[in-house]
UniProtKB/Swiss-Prot annotation:
This is L-threonine 3-dehydrogenase. Zn(2+) 2 binds at residues 93, 96, 99, 107. NAD(+) binds at residues 175, 195, 200, 261-263, 285-286. Belongs to the zinc-containing alcohol dehydrogenase family.
């Protein structure tokens, strides 16, 4: 079967022929229909410092997908051949304190598909049946293909009460863009998104952001004054940029709450006085809550949330290089690849 493989320890991804995997007793074989390129996949493609210490060459990458059940393991019940599914890409152990305590998204033994084990950029893949998420008929496959990052956005946006609140989102990648839309959809007052990429800031505005700010051209403090704000009640840090995080700390209202998804450089510093003397709450966000986030994000789409606005490109798998080029250049929202 075709698969996108990190063949060499260099920049690039290669379309190769690999064997079709065989599902174990509790696993399901999935025939992939559509997959989406994630920022993580771009890191692996670029072969940056994180990838070099994390990824083993020869890996089939990818973790954002939708497909149909092609084969059931001998112990699997509750699913049918041909059923359309996505899946939680974090495979957890099921027996640690957090898994047994109802917090599997915090499992210290988590294995990520497309990072630690072979992933979804292939014609077929296997997944534990317990990780599957059935996709309702009303949701098109090109949207279901990126439920994984949509879930990251939902986890962040729903971590704190944003109804009637002023929200600052630093980083207008696809997750930040989606989070901006969720915050407005559920009743935030002002949602301000910052970045230095005008293409993606426009997507955030289209998704419903009150104001978008290119911080290389405009002062965030000036925007706050224009909106008659004393500070932000909720911050969602999506950029992984320490300067953006420190700007957020500077602009938070006393008692504000921050959800952090962006991964900061090792050794990145911050002004701890701002956190302490403003009484800020800072909450790390990892993955999606299993499976509360999946329920909520599915119902958001079914209730009219415009997830489609972040989808900018759909390409056949043979044009995968164009998709990675668009991502590298920052000239795309979500890029979906078709395996049909």
């Amino acid at each position: 079967m075709k698969a996108l493989v990190k063949r060499e320890a260099n920049k690039g991804i290669w379309l190769e022929q690999v064997p079709v995997p065989t599902p174990g007793p509790n696993e399901v074989l999935i025939k992939l229909e559509k997959t989406a390129i994630c920022g993580t996949d771009l890191h692996i493609y670029l072969w940056d410092e994180w990838s070099q210490r994390t990824i083993e060459p020869g890996l089939t990458i990818g973790h954002e997908f939708v497909g149909r059940v092609a084969e059931l393991g001998s112990a699997v019940t509750g699913y049918q051949i041909g059923q359309r599914v996505s899946a939680e890409g974090h495979i957890v152990c099921g027996h640690c304190r957090n898994c047994r305590g109802g917090r599997p998204h915090l499992c210290p033994n988590t294995v990520g598909i497309g990072v630690n084990v072979n992933g979804a950029f292939a014609e077929y893949m296997v997944m534990p049946a317990s990780n599957l998420w059935p996709i309702p008929d009303q949701i098109p496959s090109e949207l279901a293909a990126f439920f994984d990052p949509y879930g990251n956005a939902a986890h962040c946006a729903l971590e704190f009460d944003v109804i009637g609140e002023d929200v600052l989102i630093t980083g207008a990648g696809p997750i930040g863009i989606i989070a901006a839309g969720i915050c407005k959809h559920i009743g935030a007052r002002n949602v301000v998104v910052t970045d230095v990429n005008d293409f993606r800031l426009k997507l955030a505005a289209d998704m419903g952001a009150t104001r978008v700010v290119n911080v290389s051209k405009t002062s965030l403090k000036d925007v706050m004054a224009d909106l008659h704000m004393e500070g932000f009640d909720v911050g969602l840090e999506m950029s992984g940029n320490s300067r953006a995080f420190n700007d957020m700390l500077d602009c938070m209202y006393h008692g504000g709450k921050i959800a952090m998804l962006g991964i900061m450089p090792r050794g990145a510093g911050c002004d701890w006085d701002k956190i302490i003397f403003k009484g800020l709450t800072v909450q790390g966000i990892y993955g999606r809550k299993m499976y509360e986030t999946w329920y909520k994000m599915t119902q958001l789409v079914l209730s009219g949330f415009p997830l489609h606005k972040v989808l900018t490109h759909q390409l056949p798998i043979d044009d995968f290089q164009k998709g990675f080029d668009l991502m590298e250049e920052g000239k795309a929202g979500k890029v979906v690849l078709s395996w049909n």
